[in-house]
């Protein structure tokens, strides 16, 4: 593990590169770069959203907002005052600088490879950031007393994806949360992908219940990935009521639009007419991710790809080539409208790594056919 402290004059703009950019650049017909599980919201959810379009002349309802809080709370068996609907997890990350300042923390810690948006937000706010670059298989290392940045008395903000994007690693964060509590530090767990996993893994690894009852843990969740809602921005935070109140005061009025609230209500509210459909959809996605991932890895392995074993609706795989050749092939695929998430913008990785979204077998087979053809036609060297 390597620790790297902020360099004041370094350009960190690469941290804002996300999979949607790769998809747009390729004008993708086969999109393997964006981690949204479905390429469209389910029909029942589209119908619910469409029903409310005629009512957009009205401001978002506070009653609906409260109902969404109560529905999400019931979904997790926590109190509604521990929930805050968000315009996607990205909005939650936008709160980090203020949380850091208010809590009197001294440094932020970001393990990598990991989702880069939190680091970009913190660095833009000129908050000291210590990155921890993990080596394959990218298992998390907790702070150690002899490390300067984690010595007793140093109050930290840790931000970790669980499962982590792009590695797919699922961490046991409970011991880390306990250790950080002893240091009077804060843990933010980004669980944007966790509801694509089997329920038993969610129960074992989610910090939702800890977040609702302690003041040093915040969880961000997303409906984007499982329900195909990236364009609508639907998520929520779970935290102690005091922290939820603090986050609420950071937001402008009417920060959640009507259609966002309607979608969240349809998905999570146990009294919603679509609740059972949402549950069935979620369970089907969980089964599909396992089966479709196995198909994808099975197709890549004979071609020499080495895939990290992870728990997510995407895989991180090392290509059989060096960075230059791997990027050339990725660009060849992009020219044929197949998008692959480049990984050299993830600290700790280079262009020899690809992140691939898990798709249905037909889509995977179409990708493999084009990839195989590109390899047969290419004159490459490592």
Language-model features, listed with the residues they occupy:
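N-terminal "arm"/small-domain region of PLP-dependent enzymes with the aminotransferase-like
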Residues: 1-59, 74, 357
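PLP-dependent aminotransferase class I/II
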Residues: 42, 63-66, 216-308
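Phosphate-binding glycine-rich loop
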Residues: 67-107
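PLP-dependent enzyme catalytic core of the Aspartate aminotransferase-like
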Residues: 335-336, 347-382
């Amino acid at each position: 593990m390597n620790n790297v402290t902020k360099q004041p004059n370094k350009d960190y703009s690469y941290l804002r590169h996300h999979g949607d950019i790769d998809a747009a650049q390729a004008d993708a017909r086969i999109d393997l770069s964006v981690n949204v599980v479905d390429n469209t919201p389910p029909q029942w959810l589209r119908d619910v959203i469409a029903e409310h379009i005629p009512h957009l002349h009205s401001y978002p309802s506070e009653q609906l907002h409260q109902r969404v809080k109560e529905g999400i709370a019931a979904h997790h068996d926590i109190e509604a005052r521990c929930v805050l609907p968000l315009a996607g997890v990205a909005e939650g990350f936008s709160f980090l600088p203020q949380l850091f300042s208010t809590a009197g923390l001294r440094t932020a810690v970001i393990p990598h490879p990991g989702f880069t948006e939190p680091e970009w937000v913190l660095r833009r706010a000129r908050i000291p950031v210590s990155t921890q670059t993990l080596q394959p298989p990218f298992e998390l290392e907790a702070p150690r007393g002899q490390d300067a940045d984690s010595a007793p008395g140093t109050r930290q903000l840790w931000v970790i994806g669980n499962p982590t994007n792009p590695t797919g690693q699922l961490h046991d964060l409970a011991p880390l949360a306990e250790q950080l509590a002893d240091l009077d530090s804060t843990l933010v767990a980004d669980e944007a992908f966790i509801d694509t996993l089997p329920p038993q893994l969610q129960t074992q690894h989610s910090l939702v219940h800890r977040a609702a009852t302690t003041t040093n843990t915040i969880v961000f969740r997303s409906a984007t990935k499982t329900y195909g809602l990236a364009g609508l921005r639907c998520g929520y935070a779970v935290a102690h009521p005091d922290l939820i109140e603090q986050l609420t005061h950071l937001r402008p009025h009417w920060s959640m639009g009507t259609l966002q609230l309607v979608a969240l209500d349809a998905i999570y509210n146990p009294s919603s007419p679509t609740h059972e459909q949402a549950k069935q959809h979620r369970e089907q996605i969980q089964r599909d991710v396992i089966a479709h991932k196995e198909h994808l890895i099975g197709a890549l392995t004979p071609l020499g790809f080495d895939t990290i074993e992870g728990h997510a609706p995407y895989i991180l795989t090392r290509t059989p080539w060096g960075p230059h050749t791997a990027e050339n092939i990725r660009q060849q695929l992009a020219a044929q409208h197949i998008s692959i998430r480049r990984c050299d913008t993830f600290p700790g990785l280079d262009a020899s790594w690809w992140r691939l979204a898990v798709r249905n077998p037909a889509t995977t087979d179409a990708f493999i056919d084009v990839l195989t053809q590109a390899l047969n036609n290419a004159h490459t060297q490592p």
